[in-house]
């Protein structure tokens, strides 16, 4: 089915070239062959079905699918270890001075909070944060599976050992309410379950009834959670995050940095590509 148009194309160029001999536009048989091949390639290009990059992928808020029915627990910066949470949260997987950089204990007691932040101080980092059970780095290098598992790896990777996950935005849904938060730690319990975080697997059993998401007190309060709960979550690009209490505070907050006029490609590379269209 594709041969006949190509023959016609070659016939066309032959006739055209013969008719223009008086003008000497083609001066040799070599030039003739090159011109014929160009027309042949153009004919094939027009005959082949064209695939536009990205047409098979969802865009905008629907680019990433929801992870539904995930047992969700609450954690906080400065949290002390307990039987069900043996790892203290003075440091995170990516920040050895997390509590210090945050500004102190992110007290979860509702009576000691106001407008989604601790009543005693304004946090220096975004109070809307989460943990998911995968870390793309270990011992100063990048895990080998991260390159194929993380959808935005190619865009944001800078060097081995620097996370492409820290600070990425996710949406967390409970009922008809959706909160937005940044990925700032790894857990609960695991840091290796990329098949769940980026694939179709479900969270693995653990001491908290198979919990697959930790959320901060600010996320808890916005969603109206009462301790352990069940939520849905998904990744979102920064440009698809609507204004809200999650865009107000923090030196690590994409939107605070943007308002300050910072170069996101230098200070928030993991979200910079996701903000490009919003800035345009």
Residue ranges: model-predicted function:
Residues 6-15:
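Bacterial N-terminal signal peptides
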Residues 23-280:
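Secreted/periplasmic proteins
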């Amino acid at each position: 089915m594709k041969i006949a148009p190509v023959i016609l194309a070659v016939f066309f160029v032959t006739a055209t070239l013969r008719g223009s001999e008086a003008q000497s536009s083609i001066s040799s048989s070599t030039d003739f062959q090159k011109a014929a091949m160009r027309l042949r390639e153009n004919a094939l290009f027009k005959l082949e079905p064209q695939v536009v990059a990205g047409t098979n992928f969802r865009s905008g808020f629907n680019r990433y699918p929801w992870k539904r029915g995930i047992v969700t627990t609450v954690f906080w910066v400065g949290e002390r270890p307990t039987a069900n949470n043996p790892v203290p949260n003075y440091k995170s997987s990516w920040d050895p001075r997390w509590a210090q950089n945050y500004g102190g204990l992110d007290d979860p007691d509702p009576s000691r909070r106001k407008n989604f932040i601790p009543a005693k101080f304004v946090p220096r980092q975004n109070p809307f944060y989460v943990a998911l059970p995968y870390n793309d780095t270990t011992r100063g290098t990048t895990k080998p599976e991260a390159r194929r598992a993380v959808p935005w790896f190619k865009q944001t990777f800078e060097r081995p050992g620097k996370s492409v996950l820290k600070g990425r935005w996710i949406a967390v849904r409970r009922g008809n309410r959706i909160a937005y938060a940044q990925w700032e730690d790894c857990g609960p319990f695991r840091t290796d379950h990329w098949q769940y975080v980026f694939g179709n697997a479900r969270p693995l059993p653990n001491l908290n009834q198979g919990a697959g998401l930790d959320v901060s007190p600010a996320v808890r309060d916005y969603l109206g959670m009462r301790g352990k709960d069940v939520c849905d979550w998904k990744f979102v690009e920064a440009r698809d995050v609507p204004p809200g209490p999650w865009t107000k505070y923090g030196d690590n907050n994409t939107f605070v940095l943007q308002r300050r006029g910072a170069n996101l490609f230098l200070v928030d590379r993991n979200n910079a590509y996701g903000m490009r269209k919003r800035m345009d």
